[in-house]
Every structure is written in structure tokens, then in C-alpha cells.
């Protein structure tokens, strides 16, 4: 169980796979499996049988979780994928800082 470096609602860029280069938002984080669910990335088609909730059934497109190593945090200040460092502020709070521009994320 690896520590996941992104949080829910973070902006990330996909760095490998069929959606490489796509900038999107993290919808969910699964730390036990080290996976993240990214909006409009890794979209799969699922064949759904008709049931009470979905009378029609059919083919549904939805996002599937991807490994957290395939995404990188996106800094909106320098408009690029970046690594992060942790910094301790004077009031004692820990913040994440962009390695490229030094902006607090």
C-alpha cells in the first residue's frame, strides 16, 4: 500500500496511457489499491443488463480507476506538471509547494 501523492479535487495531468497529456480533476482516491479516479480519463464501455433502476440497459461509458503513478500534479501558476515538496509555514501548518515555481498548491 503506497502513499498516494494526490488528493480529491486536485488538478492532475495524465503522464502515460491512452489519455496522456489530458489535464483533469481527481474525483476519488483509493489509497489501499493506490488508484485514483480522474474525470474524463480512462473511460471504459460497460455493458449493463436491464434492471429496476435502469430499465433500458445497454452500453454505458464511465471512468475507471487508474494507478496513481500515471498522474502528476498540475500547477495552475506555471501551467505544467510538477513534483511537490512539503513546507512548514510559520504558523505550524504543512503545505504542498510546487517544485518549479514555489507556489503553494
Curated annotation (Swiss-Prot):
Keywords: Ribonucleoprotein, Ribosomal protein, RNA-binding, rRNA-binding. InterPro entries: KOW, Rib_uL2_dom2, Ribosomal_uL24, Ribosomal_uL24_KOW, Translation_prot_SH3-like_sf. GO terms for molecular function: rRNA binding; structural constituent of ribosome. It comes from the Bacteria. GO terms for biological process: translation. GO terms for cellular component: ribonucleoprotein complex; ribosome. One of two assembly initiator proteins, it binds directly to the 5'-end of the 23S rRNA, where it nucleates assembly of the 50S subunit. One of the proteins that surrounds the polypeptide exit tunnel on the outside of the subunit. Belongs to the universal ribosomal protein uL24 family. Part of the 50S ribosomal subunit. This is Large ribosomal subunit protein uL24. It comes from Clostridium novyi (strain NT). The gene is rplX.
Amino acid at each position: 500500500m503506497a502513499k498516494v501523492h494526490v488528493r480529491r479535487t486536485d488538478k492532475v495531468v495524465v503522464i502515460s496511457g491512452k489519455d496522456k497529456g489530458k489535464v483533469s480533476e481527481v474525483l476519488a482516491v483509493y489509497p489501499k489499491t493506490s488508484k485514483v479516479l480522474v474525470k474524463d480519463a480512462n473511460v471504459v464501455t460497460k455493458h449493463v443488463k436491464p434492471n429496476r433502476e435502469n430499465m433500458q440497459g445497454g452500453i454505458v461509458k464511465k471512468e475507471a480507476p487508474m494507478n496513481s503513478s500515471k498522474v502528476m500534479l498540475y500547477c495552475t501558476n506555471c501551467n505544467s506538471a510538477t513534483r511537490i515538496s512539503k513546507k512548514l509555514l510559520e504558523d505550524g501548518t504543512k503545505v504542498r509547494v510546487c517544485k518549479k515555481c514555489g507556489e503553494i498548491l
